[in-house]
Amino acid sequence: MVHLKSLAGILLYTSLCIASSQQAPASINNAFVAKGKKYFGTCADQGTLSDGTNSGIIKADFGQLTPENSMKWDATEPSQGKFSFSGADYLVNYAATNNKLIRGHTLVWHSQLPSWVQGITDKNTLTSVLKNHITTVMNRYKGKVYAWDVVNEIFNEDGTLRSSVFYNVLGEDFVRIAFETARAADPQAKLYINDYNLDSANYGKTTGLANHVKKWIAQGIPIDGIGSQTHLSAGGSSGVKGALNTLAASGVSEVAITELDIAGASSNDYVNVVEACLEVSKCVGITVWGVSDKNSWRSAESPLLFDGNYQPKSAYNAILNAL
């Protein structure tokens, strides 16, 4: 009997050790959510989602996905009225299977825009095209996308509106048309304006965007959030908290860091950004723009939390320690 008890004890101990060794690694998303935020996410598309190593990190560490390219206009409506959703469907299905939130990106942007849209000069035609595109894309994923970047990069560095086919043909009214159409298409989705270089409170682009959003909200335009892309240079993190406060003061219900990457990926810079979001109550989440430097649009600058071999960097551990 003594031998059986000893054997039972050994088996129990062994099983506990095995279970412990198979536990998922620490998750930045889980730690961030435990601090009261909605998500810590990343961007991807079918290529990176079908990579086993990359996908494994996403499943373990990130709670939200943004399509890097598959929901942009050139991907979803390359020819007028002829929609293609294979890439976007893949991401949406992956997110549903793995319980990840989705930020839809992006409905109206001057870049990655098909030439047939860029060539429109008639107001009524462009209005109709804009409404049809937004409605068709959003209806396909209605109830599945937490937030949409409705308009993307519509400001110049001095805080004025950028020249684009949308602004040149419709004037500032394209913003109202886009947001009202989006609200009608999916009333439950959070509707965002998204831009880059919103990293300092007193910078012209930051104040100009915030002032425009305040005015538009006062006019009844349904803007819920501002997304700050936060593509930073090394050492560029010190102004992020102040900038988020400026954006939050515009009257939106939430702000988010939407495309984070930092040249050199220093622990100090990454922790500064994470703490900025934690300290700004309206900041609901952070999305880093990729998993591994291997797939980053800035790969030469090593800006992400995992290196080219998918190994976590010191900044990854620093974030977990800060949380």
From Swiss-Prot:
Disulfide bonds join 277-283. This is Endo-1,4-beta-xylanase F3. The promoter does not contain any 5'-GGCTAAA-3' sequence identified as binding sites for the xylanolytic transcriptional activator xlnR. SMART domains: Glyco_10 (SM00633). It is found in: Secreted. One of its GO terms (biological process) is xylan catabolic process. Belongs to the glycosyl hydrolase 10 (cellulase F) family. It catalyses: Endohydrolysis of (1->4)-beta-D-xylosidic linkages in xylans. Keywords: Carbohydrate metabolism, Disulfide bond, Glycosidase, Hydrolase, Polysaccharide degradation, Secreted, Signal, Xylan degradation. Its EC number is 3.2.1.8. Optimum temperature is 58 degrees Celsius. The purified enzyme showed complete stability under 60 degrees Celsius.
